[in-house]
Amino acid sequence: MTSGDHSDTGANTALPKKGNAAVSVIMINRNGGSYLGPAVATCRTAIEHALTIEPRIEFLIVDNGSTDHPEAVIDQQLQGAPFEWRVVHALTPGVNHARNAGLEGSAGGLIFLVDSDVEFDPQWLSAYLLAASRHPGARVFAGRVKVGRLEMPAPSWLALEGPLARTSIVVQCDYGNEVREIPLDDSSGPVGPNMGFRRDVFTEFGNFDTRFGLRPGSLVPGAETEMFDRLARKGLRFLFVPGAIVYHPLKKSQMTKSYFRKRLHGVGRAISRLRRSRGERATRVLGVTLSVLPQLTIAAARRIGSTLTFQSPAQRFHATGDVAIWLGYLHEDFIDWRAGASVNDRDSAPVP
């Protein structure tokens, strides 16, 4: 039953479906380094626990151009695994290219997408499967994401919880202790390291938009943001499953102000792209989006005020982050204006 196949694919090249899996766990990896082994090992444990609920489970690891030779680590961790598994090599850089390759190469009607730097609670997959069986009408799923291992103590300017936490970077997802359905909207939804779908969602609404998401040389995020915006506009909701827990680390290289500013600048760019994907058009003067200027002015005034009123380092840096977001929005809109059309539309099919 165990498989160690290694397949190559571009993001839009369909792979033959292998076996008759009912559930597909798809892990996206690019240079996972020391995090990959624990991610695969703890995911294996979670899958093995779930086999008593559903024995037809497959595990795909989609490698998106790693240079750290992950195959040896994967083979070591999955040797003798009592379920189908394989590695898919997605050749086109970008997390959404990798996700789409995983969708095309998997067979399950129930799909869970995860990252290769998280660690899994042993009951992670069991919680999802039980919730899915008890809520057959649910089509989108979110698990709980907690802050995992810190490679260094968090600096004073970095809030890990509360209203100042940047949960798109210090990744977290928590909507309480009850399994419940929640509307998809701008402030509520699953997060990329721990989310699930019934396959018919992609059949009906299309795959992930490859104009969005982190890729080599780009810190513009929002890989799943466009998908959830698309689904929200069609009235879909998501089922939050609190027992489906993963732990997301915070790496030393990420705990710098420069990294956060770049990521938040990317958040602003992603917001601009999302609004364009909706067909929204901005009023500009010399490339400057007029509707954004009040938000940028307010954010800048708040940043200055946070210094003048001797607010905490975390409060001051949160205000700095808001400025970075709106500057990113203006940057993306200016690029679009200068090009005369979205520079990203050349790389992707139209959004459904």
For each predicted feature, which ranges?
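Non-catalytic, C-terminal membrane-associated alpha-helical segments of glycosyltransferases
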Residues: K262-R269, R276-P352
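Conserved donor NDP-sugar-binding/catalytic core segment of glycosyltransferases
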Residues: Q123-L160
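A short, conserved alpha-helix in the catalytic core of glycosyltransferases
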Residues: G192-F197, V201-G206, R211-A244
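Short, flexible, basic/aromatic active-site loop/helix in glycosyltransferases
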Residues: E161-S187
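Short, well-formed alpha-helical segments that are part of the catalytic scaffolds
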Residues: G32-E48
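Short aromatic/hydrophobic "clamp" motif used to bind/position activated sugar donors
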Residues: I111
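Glycine-rich, basic loop-to-helix element that forms the pyrophosphate-binding segment
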Residues: A90-S106
